[in-house]
């Protein structure tokens, strides 16, 4: 009996699977059963979709773990060379003649500090966030970063997968949600800049009153994200708050001059503002027009603060 079959699936699991399946596209790596199928999906189909969602969730947790590991290492080794940071881009991709894959990477999407080929530690390309196969494109991307004209709007890569994979690539490329995972070495002298910043952290106004990092716990509903973000359900939002007295965490000479002029002409020159000096990346599982994807946001959570 159908009812007996459905009882083999855990109730909370099936509710989660049905909720996720309602967001997924036809034909993708996380596709729904065919719309024309009138009967309710059986346990084997539910198990298959549940496994695919678990795979996406595992990729999310793995990426989050790598990002946190990068951050923890960097925070505890500020005088050493930190581990590579992870950034995820979404290049344009098309399948050319002979089974070649052509990638177009917009320069506007490249992280700060590129194009410096020496900063690129590793680059991995996948046709979708859930694809099991990836291509190491570190060498061709380094070459493009070294040779391409700085004014060129995009970088172009051509991949030559094995002939045995051409048919599968042809089928997957039409519904691809490509992902380029970059592992970047940090820019030089970062730890020394942080050490100098910590030396000027004594607040003349009293503890907790000057420019500093502040954390607020917020739900997806609080942020207005509940209709498009699936995970995490709660975010520890870090932001910069506090006053900017003279010489406190001044970002540059302009901030110092602004402080001096504010003392002389407070009605016409505003005081410096406390703003983020750098950011921590954040990974979201989010709904898209074509299904569910992982997305890294590089400028969402403040990491350090200064006055400007």
From Swiss-Prot:
Glycosylation sites (chain numbering): 70
One example GO MF annotation: growth factor activity
Result, substituting residue 285 to A: Reduces cellular signaling mediated by GFRAL and RET. Abolishes interaction with GFRAL and GDF15-mediated food-intake inhibition
Name of this chain's protein: Growth/differentiation factor 15
Subunit structure, interactors included: Homodimer; disulfide-linked. Interacts with GFRAL and RET; ligand of GFRAL, which mediates GDF15 internalization and cellular signaling through interaction with RET via the formation of a 2:2:2 ternary complex composed of GDF15, GFRAL and RET.
Effect of residue 283 to A: Reduces cellular signaling mediated by GFRAL and RET
An annotated GO cellular component: cytoplasm
Noted disease: Hyperemesis gravidarum: An autosomal dominant condition characterized by severe nausea and vomiting in pregnancy. It occurs in up to 2% of pregnancies and leads to significant weight loss, dehydration, electrolyte imbalance, and ketonuria. It is associated with both maternal and fetal morbidity.
Effect of residue 283 to R: Abolishes interaction with GFRAL. Abolishes RET phosphorylation and cellular signaling mediated by GFRAL and RET
Bias kind Polar residues: ranges: 165-177
Removed propeptide positions: 30-194
Extent of the signal sequence: 1-29
Lyase in keyword set: no
Organism field: Homo sapiens
Keywords: Cleavage on pair of basic residues, Cytokine, Disease variant, Disulfide bond, Glycoprotein, Hormone, Secreted, Signal
Miscellaneous notes: GDF15 was initially considered as a promising factor for the treatment of obesity due to its ability of GDF15 to reduce appetite and promote weight loss. However, while activation of the GDF15-GFRAL signaling pathway is efficient to reduce obesity and promote weight loss in mouse, it only has limited effect in human.
GO BP annotation list: cell-cell signaling; cellular response to chemical stress; GDF15-GFRAL signaling pathway; negative regulation of appetite; negative regulation of growth hormone receptor signaling pathway; negative regulation of leukocyte migration; negative regulation of multicellular organism growth; negative regulation of SMAD protein signal transduction
PROSITE patterns recorded: TGF_BETA_2 (PS51362)
Pfam families found in the cross-reference section: TGF_beta (PF00019)
Tissues expressing this chain: Detected in plasma (at protein level). Highly expressed in placenta, with lower levels in prostate and colon and some expression in kidney.
Cross-referenced InterPro entries: Cystine-knot_cytokine, TGF-b_C, TGF-beta-rel
Described purpose of this protein according to its UniProt entry: Hormone produced in response to various stresses to confer information about those stresses to the brain, and trigger an aversive response, characterized by nausea, vomiting, and/or loss of appetite. The aversive response is both required to reduce continuing exposure to those stresses at the time of exposure and to promote avoidance behavior in the future. Acts by binding to its receptor, GFRAL, activating GFRAL-expressing neurons localized in the area postrema and nucleus tractus solitarius of the brainstem.
Residues covered by region (Disordered): 152-177
UniProt key word Signal: yes
